[in-house]
């Protein structure tokens, strides 16, 4: 009966894939999975798993680790990746408890690639968030073997009867998932990249970044131990994937499709290289976290160090000299320690006391910090600026792409809602995002922080991030459904440890900037070596313009 039912299946989105028994259903989707591969991919798949091994044979943990070059004892490998293979072996019966097979691994490769998943399931789109949460959740009771009919379409659409809206997954599993995804985000340059087990030895460092992502879903999670007693809902996970870390799955398909390349066609070239420039903020780990939001190829290959306050000095004028010639987008990074007690700091630091007189701090009743913010003092912010920097002592600059990003202790995204939205005040006002210009007068100074704003004082010693809700130039935060006790307003006042600006952009922007620098250097050289023979009109014109002469070397204008 099962064979007769499957022989009449048509593969269109309007057809019904119905089967009279479980084995016929699984056999059909196994055969369909193999048909998704080209002849070359099928050959490579069989070469990798072993010429004499059938795809339906059992796959143990060590064999899977060998296939992908990952140590079998890494927690995310055993608790996440191997679980995916186990649960998808009998797809679309995801609650079936059959032993994992190589066919299950092939289905993982197909279902985590958008195009392949759409063809395999005959759906225009496939919700990765739903699939991941369903796989991480404990399996429910499998289908009754005595049912009269297995409906393949219904099993796919409902993920084998999973109530997605009611899903709750242990937070520790989501933490393992993020650690897995972050490690391959940094490592995988392409789908034919060969990875070494030694690359995954420092997975604990990635777990610390993963905690920042996890806290964006649940701000009551402070440490790994908290994750063992918390759960993440589908609404939280889907909201985070939509607006906090939209690129977190970008490298998963590349990692999985290593299976479709034979050894001679693979490369050990990695996406990242060890950071050459000295930086206390911008490390490969931080770039990996930032690549959950921005294209990772630009972050790992096209970042240009422009200004590091720890080396060049905490100075607005040095910032201006180092950054203002860069005509492509930039990212400003600020790291610091949250000031917990203003009174104690004021007694030790008179400059901070003066700053508080200029900057109207929130009242205690309005200061409602989340638990993870209260427990974690180290803060990191990144601000993406597309417009070239310029001095604006009266007006503002910055377009709708300006984005304030909190990276630690949790990741939150604050997008521009109005433009312009930035000032660089060179007469004592400092740097501000989301605020109107401060009032700087001989009698005193006054800041006017916006509802969602980030302010750096002119000495680059203190910074303040304020979030009191809607109504400002920036959104109030990422669109993750929050529990009822979520703080409505808060302010982070921090003592700056370091401040850096890095040029950002694709290869085209980088080449244009290099060409501009080369042109400016050539022009400066021409001016410097103009002959000073009597009657030289060029020299006279340049002296009149104040470009050369009077002890000036003739640098770029």
Curated annotation (Swiss-Prot):
Disulfide bonds: none annotated. GO terms for biological process: protein-containing complex disassembly; response to oxidative stress. It is found in: Cytoplasm. Residues 280-505 form the TLDc domain. Its main location: cytoplasm. PROSITE patterns: TLDC. InterPro entries: TLDc_dom. May be involved in a process influencing telomere capping. This is Restriction of telomere capping protein 5. It comes from Eremothecium gossypii (strain ATCC 10895 / CBS 109.51 / FGSC 9923 / NRRL Y-1056). The lineage of its organism: Eukaryota, Fungi, Dikarya, Ascomycota, Saccharomycotina.
């Amino acid at each position: 009966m099962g064979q007769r039912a499957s022989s009449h299946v048509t593969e269109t989105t309007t057809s019904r894939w119905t089967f009279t028994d479980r084995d016929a259903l699984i056999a059909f989707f196994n055969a369909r999975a193999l048909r998704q591969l080209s002849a070359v991919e099928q050959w490579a798949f069989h070469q990798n798993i072993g010429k004499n091994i059938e795809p339906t044979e059992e796959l143990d943990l060590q064999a899977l680790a060998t296939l992908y070059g990952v140590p079998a004892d890494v927690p995310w490998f055993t608790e996440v990746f191997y679980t995916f293979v186990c649960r998808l072996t009998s797809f679309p019966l995801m609650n079936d408890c059959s032993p994992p097979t190589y066919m299950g691994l092939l289905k993982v490769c197909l279902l985590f690639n958008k195009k392949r998943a759409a063809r395999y399931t005959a759906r225009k789109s496939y919700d990765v968030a739903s699939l991941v949460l369903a796989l991480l959740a404990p399996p429910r009771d499998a289908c009754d073997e005595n049912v009269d009919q297995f409906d393949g379409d219904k099993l796919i659409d409902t993920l084998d009867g999973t109530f997605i809206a009611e899903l709750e997954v242990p937070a520790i599993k989501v933490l393992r998932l993020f650690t897995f995804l972050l490690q391959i985000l940094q490592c995988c340059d392409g789908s034919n990249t060969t990875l070494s087990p030694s690359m995954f030895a420092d997975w604990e460092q990635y777990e610390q970044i993963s905690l920042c992502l996890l806290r964006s879903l649940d701000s009551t999670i402070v440490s790994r131990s908290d994750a063992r007693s918390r759960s993440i809902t589908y609404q939280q996970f889907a909201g985070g994937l939509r607006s906090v870390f939209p690129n977190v799955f970008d490298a998963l398909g590349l990692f999985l499709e290593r299976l479709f390349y034979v050894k001679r066609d693979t490369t050990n070239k990695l996406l990242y290289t060890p950071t050459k420039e000295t930086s206390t903020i911008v490390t490969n780990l931080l770039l990996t976290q930032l690549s959950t939001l921005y294209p990772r190829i630009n972050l790992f290959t096209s970042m240009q160090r422009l200004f590091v306050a720890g080396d060049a000095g905490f100075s607005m004028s040095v910032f201006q000299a180092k950054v203002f010639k860069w005509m492509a987008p930039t990212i400003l990074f600020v790291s610091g320690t949250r000031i917990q007690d203003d009174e104690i700091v004021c007694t030790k630091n008179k400059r901070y006391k003066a700053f508080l007189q200029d900057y109207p701090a929130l009242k205690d009743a309005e200061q409602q910090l989340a638990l993870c913010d209260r427990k974690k003092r180290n803060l990191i912010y990144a601000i993406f600026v597309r417009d070239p920097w310029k001095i604006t002592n009266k007006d503002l600059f910055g377009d709708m792409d300006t984005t304030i990003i909190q990276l630690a202790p949790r990741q939150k995204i604050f997008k521009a809602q109005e433009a312009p939205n930035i000032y660089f005040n060179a007469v004592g006002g400092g740097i501000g995002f989301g605020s109107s210009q401060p009032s700087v007068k001989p009698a005193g100074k006054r800041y006017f922080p916006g509802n969602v704003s980030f302010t750096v004082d002119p000495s680059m010693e203190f910074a303040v991030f304020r979030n009191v809700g809607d109504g400002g130039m920036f959104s109030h935060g990422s669109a993750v459904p929050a529990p009822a006790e979520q703080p409505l307003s808060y302010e982070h006042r921090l003592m700056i440890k370091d401040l850096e600006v890095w040029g950002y952009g694709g290869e085209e922007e980088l080449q244009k900037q290099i060409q501009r620098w080369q042109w400016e250097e050539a022009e400066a050289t021409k001016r410097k070596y103009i002959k000073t023979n009597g009657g030289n009109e060029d020299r006279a014109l340049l002296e009149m313009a104040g470009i050369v002469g009077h002890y000036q070397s003739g640098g770029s204008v």
